[in-house]
Structure formats: C-alpha cells, structure tokens
C-alpha cells in the first residue's frame, strides 16, 4: 500500500474540493514567486510547493568568505517550480548521500553551484485565507561538506501534519567554513547562511500561511549539530522557538574546530596554489580562484575519508564550525557550562547504531570488509580515528578494553568497536547536551531510534538496525512517497511525523493515540522508537560516566594551557 504523489493538472483541478484552478503566486518581501500545487493521495487539500526561492544574494566574487547579504528584489513573477542547484561539493559524495537519504521515489540529480542560497517551501495552507500554521525549518546533514535541501521532500510531512515545511541550503566545505581564525576570514559562513534563512522565514513565511511566532528548527547529523549551534548562538535569538537535533550536536567534536585553525587554512591555500604569507594574502588569492579550482582543491584535500597513513592528529576529515566570536562567543563546552543559550523546548535523539554502516563503510571507507576485528587492530584503528573521536593515544588501551575486552569473538569485537565510536561521536555528546539543556530549566525530550527501514541500501547488513540517517525515512514520510513499505513501517512513519509535528506545535511531542513520551528530567526518561515504541530511562548513562571519567584523566595529566580534547 503505497500512496502516490501526483501533480494536479491545473485544468482538471477539482472544483468540488475548492482546488485552485491556477497555480499559487505569493508575494514575498523581495518580489512575487510562482509555485505549483501537488496532491498527496488521500488528502483533499493540495500542498503548494515553491522551489529555489533566494533568501540571500549569490555569495560570488568579493562576497565569497563573507556573511550573506539580503537578496536583491525582483519586479517580475519569479518561477519557483524547479530545484535549485546544491552548494558546490564533492559530486560523488553528494550524490551518494542523496541517494541513501532521500525520501523521494527517485533521487533528483542536482547541479552544483556556488550560487546556492535558496530554500524550498511546502505549505498545505489555503493561500486565499489567513492561516498561521506551525513552521518546520529543515537543515540537512552531510558533515558540513555535502548535502542539499532538495534531497528531502517535505510534501508528506506538510500534508499529514498540516505544517509548513521549509528546507534550506547553506554554503558547504571551503565555501562555507574556510577560516583563517582572524578578521580576514572568520569562518562559519554556512551557519550565517542558516541564520539568514531563518531571518527570511521571519519576514516572509506569513505570506505562505506560516506562523513566524512558531518556528521549529530541525536537522540531522551536521544539520543536528547546526541546530545545536544555533541554540548556543546570540545571532539566532528570537529566530526560532523549538529545536530538534537528530544524531548530531555541538559537542560532536569532529564538526567543531577548537584550537588553532590556521594550519588547515594554510594547507587549503597551498593545495590551491596560493601563498600563505598572511591571512589577507591567502583570502585574496582564494577569492580569485574559480569555482572549479576550489572544487579541485576540495577533492585533493581528501575530506571525509580515513587517513591510514601519517599522524592522525594532523588529519583533517572536514572543515567545521569555529569559535569566531560572532556566531559562537566561546566553545560549545563553555557556553553549555555557563547555561548561556536559548532555553527553547529541545528534542535531542540518537539512533541505536550511529556508526553501524553508512559512515564507516560508505563515507569513510573503514578497512572492515572482513567483518571482524582483533584487539590489536582495533587499537590501531581507534588511533587512526583520532579526527573523529579525539581519544589521546594513552587512553586507547583502556577504552578498547572497556568495550571489546568482554569477548574473544572477533565479529563481536568489530560490532563493539563500532559502538565505541558511535558513543563518542553521537551518544555521549547528545546526552550531555540534553542534560545541560534540562538543567537550564528548558523542556527537553530524548529518543533512541531503533528500526531498519525497508528503503535501506541492499549493501547494508541486515543486522544494522538504527544506522545513521535511518530515522529520516520516518520523519519525512517516505512510506507515502516510495513503494514497498510494510504496514508496520507506515504506522511508524505516521507516529514519528505526529510526534515531531506535535513538538513543533506545542513544544511537547505527546498527543492523543500516541505512546507516552516522558520529559527528560532528573529521572532521565526517554523514548525508544521502533517496531515497539516504549519509554525507558537513563539513555547511555554508564557510557557518559565512563567517557567523562576517561577524558578527565587526560585533562588532569596535562596542564590546561596545552590543547586537550573534551567532550
């Protein structure tokens, strides 16, 4: 039983349902936009879709490595019915991620462009009336290096839950996060794009039937980390009212660059053929490079891959969020400790096997194809994983023993090794963020997603349940857009969409006919979401204690002025 989305031909629009017979046109602050109506089977009210609306001026030429500028107005009716290009990125990795994550029946091949600051809107509102529906703004994942708004079709979520869904793009990789650590290129350009998109939503969403006073930001992976950063950022004040981080928070250390960012900037400049005399020289030279030249530089840098040679402490798997004194005034750890953040209702969740298959096997090519691992190889591989987990060499034996020591089975050891990395990258940071948010007195909810979507790649082992990204199919209603979902999967997606939309409406996911989801308070109740959805307590409690303790040892051994890594 799959439900087909089909475009309502203007002429055959059924007057009985009051379907508009001409396509939707909406007036924005910058000019008029033309969209299209699409109906989802089973829903009388069509969804108006607007694709590729510019929310900022194209960040080209002298605007490269600068904060986004407001879009230029236009005087004609802008056609917003085709997908915008995705921000420039490694096309292979971008295409792969899109194919693995899309909830569409067919993945859309997207062009690349540095001119990419666009958003898509899905609104179920009757645009002839004054509606004020809750707004859900989606920030895609992809390690801040790849990804696109159009991978995610907001149609099913908008239709089922009567919410306005907005999917946004932001500069990625060198374009989005190049930082010299000083005023010449502060960095965080991609996050500033996210802020600009939220400003645009405040100014315009009412014309699309959305309520600017009820905006929920939600995102997965680097999108979840972005949401978490916006919760910590003074620049995002009053731009959103609730937040959801799926599988990624600002304490996910691989995405946040602490310490000196200059060496990475110099490495990029050298790879691009620029002199590194001063920051100003590097930035000036990189601004002269064509988009193609910077893409070539990106590919040469071999981001998003595990470097098995060389010193892992010097390996750079991605460019990330930096402490720029504007977006982030201090490190996420310091802001968390000071409780210096927006105390909006916050939902934070992880999947049961975050490092189960997609990240290690598809994105980073871990040498695990044999499907087993002995203790010695595990220790060496954990050291090579330093860029992801920041575990000091002297702590590796203890960490490996703790996770892998209980078994001699090398297949089990491999699974436990993947659990270890998942805990350090996602599980432990997510719980710490949720605890800090709760302790600041803000409503907090946690979940662990444990389900294997039928849409998973055939290459993924059947034993991997709750891999990174698996919840996306439920959140975006994939069973209503793709073929082949079971009744169980359809029910799960309906439930998840209802939880997410209730949270967007009320700051509380609970509602009639749904399993009870306890608030994350001192008892640390959370929801396990899957074939059997039920409340449980103390998610990753023991793991948080172990890692907090282990990282504290390292901090004590080394005086604070030397760089140490903390979760």
UniProtKB/Swiss-Prot annotation:
Family under the similarity heading: Belongs to the type-B carboxylesterase/lipase family.
Active-site residue numbers: 221 (acyl-ester intermediate), 354 (charge relay system), 468 (charge relay system)
Q: What does this protein do?
A: Involved in the detoxification of xenobiotics and in the activation of ester and amide prodrugs. Hydrolyzes aromatic and aliphatic esters, but has no catalytic activity toward amides or a fatty acyl-CoA ester. Hydrolyzes the methyl ester group of cocaine to form benzoylecgonine. Catalyzes the transesterification of cocaine to form cocaethylene. Displays fatty acid ethyl ester synthase activity, catalyzing the ethyl esterification of oleic acid to ethyloleate. Converts monoacylglycerides to free fatty acids and glycerol. Hydrolyzes of 2-arachidonoylglycerol and prostaglandins.
**Which sequence positions carry the modification called Phosphoserine?**
380
Q: Which cysteines are joined by disulfide bonds?
A: 87-116, 274-285
**What biological-process terms (Gene Ontology) are attached?**
cellular response to cholesterol; cellular response to low-density lipoprotein particle stimulus; cholesterol biosynthetic process; cholesterol ester hydrolysis involved in cholesterol transport; cholesterol homeostasis; cholesterol metabolic process; epithelial cell differentiation; lipid catabolic process
List locations, semicolon-separated. Endoplasmic reticulum lumen; Cytoplasm; Lipid droplet
Identify the main location. endoplasmic reticulum
Q: Fill in the PTM field for this protein.
A: Contains sialic acid.
Q: How does activity depend on pH?
A: Optimum pH is 6.5.
Question: What's the effect of swapping residue 468 to A?
Answer: Loss of activity
Q: Which PROSITE patterns would you find in this protein's record?
A: CARBOXYLESTERASE_B_1, CARBOXYLESTERASE_B_2
Q: What domain of life does the native source organism fall in?
A: Eukaryota
Glycosylation sites per record:
79
Q: Which reaction does it catalyse?
A: a carboxylic ester + H2O = an alcohol + a carboxylate + H(+); 4-methylumbelliferyl acetate + H2O = 4-methylumbelliferone + acetate + H(+); a cholesterol ester + H2O = cholesterol + a fatty acid + H(+); cholesteryl (9Z-octadecenoate) + H2O = cholesterol + (9Z)-octadecenoate + H(+)
Regarding tissue, the record states: Expressed predominantly in liver with lower levels in heart and lung. Expressed in macrophages.
How does it associate, per the subunit comment?
Homotrimer and homohexamer. Binds to beta-glucuronidase.
The UniProt keywords, alphabetically, are: Cytoplasm, Disulfide bond, Endoplasmic reticulum, Glycoprotein, Hydrolase, Lipid droplet, Lipid metabolism, Phosphoprotein, Serine esterase, Signal
Question: Which gene is this protein's source?
Answer: CES1
Please state what the protein is called: Liver carboxylesterase 1
Quick one: signal sequence residues? 1-17
Q: Which organism is it from?
A: Homo sapiens (Human)
Q: How is its activity regulated?
A: Activated by CHAPS. Inhibited by chlorpyrifos oxon (IC(50)=0.21 nM), paraoxon (IC(50)=0.29 nM), or methyl paraoxon (IC(50)=49 nM).
Stated EC number for the protein is: 3.1.1.1, 3.1.1.13, 3.1.1.56
A GO term, aspect molecular function: methylumbelliferyl-acetate deacetylase activity
Q: Does the keyword Ribonucleoprotein apply?
A: no
């Amino acid at each position: 039983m799959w439900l087909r989305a089909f475009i309502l031909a203007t002429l055959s629009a059924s007057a009985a349902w009051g379907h508009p017979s001409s396509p939707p046109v909406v007036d924005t602050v910058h000019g008029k936009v033309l969209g299209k109506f699409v109906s989802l089977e089973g829903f009388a009210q069509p969804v108006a879709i607007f694709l590729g609306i510019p929310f900022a001026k194209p960040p080209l030429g002298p605007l490269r490595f600068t904060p986004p500028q407001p879009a230029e107005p236009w005087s004609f009716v802008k056609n917003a019915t085709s997908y915008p290009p995705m921000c420039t990125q490694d096309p292979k990795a971008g295409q792969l991620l899109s194919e693995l994550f899309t909830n569409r029946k067919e993945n859309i091949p997207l062009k690349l462009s540095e001119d990419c600051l666009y958003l898509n809107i899905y609104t179920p509102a009757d645009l002839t009336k004054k509606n004020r529906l809750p707004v859900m703004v989606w920030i895609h994942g992809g390690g801040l290096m790849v990804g696109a708004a159009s991978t995610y079709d907001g149609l099913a979520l908008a239709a089922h839950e009567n919410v306005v869904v907005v999917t946004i793009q932001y500069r990625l990789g060198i374009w989005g996060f190049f930082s010299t650590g000083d005023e010449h290129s502060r960095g965080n350009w991609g996050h500033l794009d996210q802020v600009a998109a939220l400003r645009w939503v405040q100014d315009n969403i009412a014309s699309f039937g959305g309520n600017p006073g009820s905006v929920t930001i939600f995102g997965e992976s680097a999108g979840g980390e972005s949401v978490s950063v916006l919760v910590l950022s003074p620049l995002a004040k009053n731009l959103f009212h609730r937040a959801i981080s799926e599988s990624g928070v600002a304490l996910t250390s691989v995405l946040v660059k602490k310490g000196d960012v200059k060496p990475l900037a110099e490495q990029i400049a050298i790879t691009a053929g620029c002199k590194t005399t001063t920051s100003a020289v590097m930035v000036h030279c990189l601004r002269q490079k064509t988009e193609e030249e910077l893409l070539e530089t990106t590919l040469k840098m071999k981001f998003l891959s595990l470097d098995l040679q060389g010193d892992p402490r010097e390996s750079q798997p991605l460019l990330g969020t930096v402490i720029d004194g504007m977006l982030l005034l201090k490190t996420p750890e310091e802001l968390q400790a000071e409780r210096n953040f927006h105390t909006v209702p916050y939902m934070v969740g992880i999947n049961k096997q975050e490092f189960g298959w997609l990240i290690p096997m598809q994105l980073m090519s871990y040498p695990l194809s044999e499907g087993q691992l002995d203790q010695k190889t595990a220790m060496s591989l954990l050291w090579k994983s330093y860029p992801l987990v920041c575990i000091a060499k002297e702590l590796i034996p203890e960490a490996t023993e703790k996770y892998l020591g209980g078994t001699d089975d090398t297949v089990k050891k491999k699974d436990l090794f993947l659990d270890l990395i998942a805990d350090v990258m996602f599980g432990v940071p997510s719980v710490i963020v949720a605890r800090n948010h709760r302790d600041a007195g803000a409503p907090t909810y946690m979940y662990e997603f444990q389900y294997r979507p039928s849409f998973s790649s055939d290459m993924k082992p059947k034993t991997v349940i709750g891999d990174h990204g698996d919840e996306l199919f439920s959140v975006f209603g994939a069973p209503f857009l793709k073929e082949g979902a079971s009744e169980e999967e359809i029910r799960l997606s309906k439930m998840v969409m209802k939880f997410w939309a209730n949270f967007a409406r009320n700051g509380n996911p609970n509602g009639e006919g749904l399993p009870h989801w306890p608030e994350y308070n001192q008892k640390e109740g959370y929801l396990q979401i899957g074939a059997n959805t039920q409340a449980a307590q103390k998610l990753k409690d023991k793991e948080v204690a172990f890692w907090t303790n282990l990282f504290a040892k390292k901090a004590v051994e080394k005086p604070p002025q030397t760089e140490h890594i903390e979760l």
